[in-house]
């Protein structure tokens, strides 16, 4: 079983997370984002573990009463693969992090 994280839980990321969640050979470790609105509330309702992509996002999520499992670094320590669904300017920065840590990744966005 492969442990997968979805970074970016927007239009694409929510669909990718749902698809991963129904696979027999994959485990969705969680989703990671900067938002604290209804999209993340939907992830919580689906019982997806939520991780904050930035310290600012962590503060906003806590203010919105969203239970978070940790930071982006925390989720990266648990995965075999990341599917990055962030906008291209963010994904480009994230790719450098994945490469530095030797994490396999797919950029989907």
Where do the model's predicted regions map?
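N-terminal Rossmann-like NAD(P) cofactor-binding subdomain of oxidoreductases
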Residues: 1-109
